[in-house]
Structure formats: C-alpha cells, structure tokens
Amino acid sequence: MKQLHFITKLLDIKDPNIQILDIINKDTHKEIIAKLDYDAPSCPECGSQMKKYDFQKPSKIPYLETTGMPSRILLRKRRFKCYHCSKMMVAETPLVKKNHQIPRIINQKIAQKLIEKISMTDIAHQLAISTSTVIRKLNDFHFEHDFSRLPKIMSWDEYAFT
C-alpha cells in the first residue's frame, strides 16, 4: 500500500526518510512516534560500504503545537556500522542539526519571538522548551556596534580632575 504523507505535510517535515509510525494523545501533549531510516552510506573513514546496524534510543524532539497542544517527536534514528574499520554512524536529517535535539523550526520560532516583546519564560512555555534554551539562542545573536564615529550628544555621570 502506498504511504500517504499527510502527517509529514501537516507538520512541515520535508525529509522523505522520516516515517511516522503512530501518534499518541497524552493528557498534556501529543507524541509522534517516528523512525529515520535510509540505505547505508559508505564509510567516511575507509570508504567501504556500511551496513544497517540497529536503531538508537528515541530522541525526544520538541515540536510546534498541533491542534492547540504541545507535541514532541520520538524519533528513532538508524545506526550504521562499518565492518571493515568498526566505525559507527547515526542517520542524519535536516530536521535537527547533528548531535542536537532542538529542531531548526523551533530555533527559528525562538528567534522570531525574541524580536517581539515577550519574556523568555513565556517563550519557553509556549514552545515547550526550557528557559535556558531560549537564553542560549539569545546569546547566539551577534550585535554589531559602530565605533567609527561618536554620537552628537555625550554625557558622563561623574568626572574628577586630578
């Protein structure tokens, strides 16, 4: 039977390698159980063909609200093993950066809400993430200061002549 990708389109997940297996409605949130699987790549170390090994423990990835409830994706990623050099590798997806658990769409939403006048705790509560994640994202911003010229008006609080 051909798989229809209604749920992945609804959640705006563009990776065709992510298969949604089940959706569980909890009292406080929705859990989307999915797996990331694709053909084994060649080994980055020795270049020989890797083989499918097993799946990782599910990553708990927070995601945007669906139907007014916070949701998270329990993503099981495929692991690959090179039997020539014993190198292990985990499947990657554009949904999240390598070795991260916060998806790119949540990072974009954090940046969007930081521009608005909303407190960090409210942002964290709305997106179902921790406040420290919002603070880390704020610290990622780089503000450019123009020190090439002085302002027209300058003032000092205290001064002393010695």
Cite the ranges covered by each PLM segment.
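Short, conserved DNA-binding cores of transcription-related domains
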Residues: 1-87, 93
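Short, positively charged, Gly/Tyr-enriched micro-motifs
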Residues: 60-162
